[in-house]
Amino acid sequence: MPPGKVLQPVLKMKVDELFLYWLSEASTQRMLQDCLRRIKAPGRDQPTPGDGEQPGAWPTAPLAAPRPSGLEPPGTPGPGPALPLGAASSPRNAPHVRGTRRSAGTRVVQTRKEEPLPPATSQSIPTFYFPRGRPQDSVNVDAVISKIESTFARFPHERATMDDMGLVAKACGCPLYWKGPLFYGAGGERTGSVSVHKFVAMWRKILQNCHDDAAKFVHLLMSPGCNYLVQEDFVPFLQDVVNTHPGLSFLKEASEFHSRYITTVIQRIFYAVNRSWSGRITCAELRRSSFLQNVALLEEEADINQLTEFFSYEHFYVIYCKFWELDTDHDLLIDADDLARHNDHALSTKMIDRIFSGAVTRGRKVQKEGKISYADFVWFLISEEDKKTPTSIEYWFRCMDLDGDGALSMFELEYFYEEQCRRLDSMAIEALPFQDCLCQMLDLVKPRTEGKITLQDLKRCKLANVFFDTFFNIEKYLDHEQKEQISLLRDGDSGGPELSDWEKYAAEEYDILVAEETAGEPWEDGFEAELSPVEQKLSALRSPLAQRPFFEAPSPLGAVDLYEYACGDEDLEPL
């Protein structure tokens, strides 16, 4: 048996064993004999039509009939759909004459007919599954439609352009930045405006079929025939945010950055919302996330950088600059050698190989060309700098799970730790023996099953970042070793609205990038002038990074190259 394999029972043999156990029971034998007797002589055991039953019909058993003792595995075939389980003690087993047996059988049938049938269970269970939200009786559709018609009456020819959709969104009771989805959902991109009749018909249908914000948002953006959102569906919505949000007004002078920002936000949306890794965001996933709450905050928060979960420009700038530093040939792709230079070669080569193996990337380009795109890099950088979130834990678990069996064996842990030991030796640092390291990690994670660590074990562990860094990030591993265990536990147990590891990293890196950009600009009077936040961003956009177009300028509909970040990869099955 190969090392690292865990013995598991053969399912068919176990089922056969349970079936033979059930078949050998005395009650089962009596029941089968009675069934065989019924088959051989059907006329003797069946009631006549005059007895109130159909010819050939078996007497109906009460639902509360006791089951025979003994182990019966789930799915074991029963004697028949209406055969009483207590038939083994039936008078038919005694050597009575034919007339007596028919009389006894008739009495049993009549007695059972007199017993009232229990009410259907399904009638007492209320509806609990609402894929498009729970219907609300308080919604007055006609009143909403009347308000919308009054709003359209203020526009020329009762047609609304994109600039008018803010008022329409408010009339619909939606947040301001739903105006883009509302406009495109009503077909406004084809003619440049939306008529009142077409919009009312569209919104009335949504109110009748979609009963919460998640279902409405998905319905507005999804492609025809779908009930989910893919990455391209978010482009028109985000293009409107870039065009109209006051916190992104400085981007009007650098339109080539629109598609870069949109690509980053789309990847962050799928990173946080698409928990199934399917590449498709459903109503249920959107409902469980905080994305729609952040969309509503776009109207209230003028500083886009305060919305750190999805829309922060500072976070985009950090991610993009880190990618540009690695992409030395500026072909919009980075290979394994480029990625190895991240953070001064902190990652092990074995882990880099796993990233490029397709374990955490979509699309076939990685396997064919050995390169990853900017969209893949967004996932990598966020996962690398914050290993405490559910998505990042899944990201690195997939990389470490070499055989894809859903558990990390001791062999897989040793496979990654060997390179860590070699790198420590090259730095003249004594490495901890693997057995000692393994004991520490098992005490840290406390797996429920001995001999393997599952994804759920790591999600329960508050120090998953320490676990992962121990096996493939030499710099962070040494940093953890220098900290006291009490300090690590304090960091893991800290509650409240404290910044996440990613937010801390992005804030620090952005300050460094702005300082470097400011220090590189000469001033005639010899003194450094204090730049406003807007001037800092404009200065950054004028940097050498902006001299070479990273994307083509977006079309009027905001089309953007998503680096073929397709969702059809068979390797990314939901965990």
From Swiss-Prot:
<dbReference type="InterPro" id="IPR011992">
    <property type="entry name" value="EF-hand-dom_pair"/>
</dbReference>
<feature type="domain" description="EF-hand">
    <location>
        <begin position="388"/>
        <end position="423"/>
    </location>
</feature>
<feature type="binding site">
    <location>
        <position position="412"/>
    </location>
    <ligand>
        <name>Ca(2+)</name>
    </ligand>
</feature>
<feature type="binding site">
    <location>
        <position position="401"/>
    </location>
    <ligand>
        <name>Ca(2+)</name>
    </ligand>
</feature>
<dbReference type="GO" id="GO:0051726">
    <property type="term" value="P:regulation of cell cycle"/>
</dbReference>
<dbReference type="GO" id="GO:0019888">
    <property type="term" value="F:protein phosphatase regulator activity"/>
</dbReference>
<feature type="binding site">
    <location>
        <position position="403"/>
    </location>
    <ligand>
        <name>Ca(2+)</name>
    </ligand>
</feature>
<feature type="region of interest" description="Disordered">
    <location>
        <begin position="41"/>
        <end position="131"/>
    </location>
</feature>
<dbReference type="InterPro" id="IPR002048">
    <property type="entry name" value="EF_hand_dom"/>
</dbReference>
<dbReference type="GO" id="GO:0005654">
    <property type="term" value="C:nucleoplasm"/>
</dbReference>
<dbReference type="GO" id="GO:0005929">
    <property type="term" value="C:cilium"/>
</dbReference>
<dbReference type="InterPro" id="IPR048855">
    <property type="entry name" value="P2R3A_B_D_EF-hand"/>
</dbReference>
<keyword id="KW-0479">Metal-binding</keyword>
<dbReference type="GO" id="GO:0005829">
    <property type="term" value="C:cytosol"/>
</dbReference>
<dbReference type="Pfam" id="PF17958">
    <property type="entry name" value="EF-hand_13"/>
</dbReference>
<dbReference type="InterPro" id="IPR041534">
    <property type="entry name" value="EF-hand_13"/>
</dbReference>
<dbReference type="InterPro" id="IPR018247">
    <property type="entry name" value="EF_Hand_1_Ca_BS"/>
</dbReference>
<dbReference type="GO" id="GO:0005509">
    <property type="term" value="F:calcium ion binding"/>
</dbReference>
<keyword id="KW-0106">Calcium</keyword>
<protein>
    <recommendedName>
        <fullName>Serine/threonine-protein phosphatase 2A regulatory subunit B'' subunit beta</fullName>
    </recommendedName>
</protein>
<keyword id="KW-0539">Nucleus</keyword>
<comment type="subunit">
    <text>PP2A consists of a common heterodimeric core enzyme, composed of a 36 kDa catalytic subunit (subunit C) and a 65 kDa constant regulatory subunit (PR65 or subunit A), that associates with a variety of regulatory subunits. Proteins that associate with the core dimer include three families of regulatory subunits B (the R2/B/PR55/B55, R3/B''/PR72/PR130/PR59 and R5/B'/B56 families), the 48 kDa variable regulatory subunit, viral proteins, and cell signaling molecules. Interacts with N-terminal region of CDC6. Interacts with NOD2.</text>
</comment>
<dbReference type="Pfam" id="PF21161">
    <property type="entry name" value="P2R3B_EF-hand"/>
</dbReference>
<feature type="binding site">
    <location>
        <position position="405"/>
    </location>
    <ligand>
        <name>Ca(2+)</name>
    </ligand>
</feature>
<comment type="function">
    <text>The B regulatory subunit might modulate substrate selectivity and catalytic activity, and might also direct the localization of the catalytic enzyme to a particular subcellular compartment.</text>
</comment>
<dbReference type="Pfam" id="PF13499">
    <property type="entry name" value="EF-hand_7"/>
</dbReference>
<dbReference type="GO" id="GO:0006470">
    <property type="term" value="P:protein dephosphorylation"/>
</dbReference>
<dbReference type="GO" id="GO:0000159">
    <property type="term" value="C:protein phosphatase type 2A complex"/>
</dbReference>
<dbReference type="GO" id="GO:0005634">
    <property type="term" value="C:nucleus"/>
</dbReference>
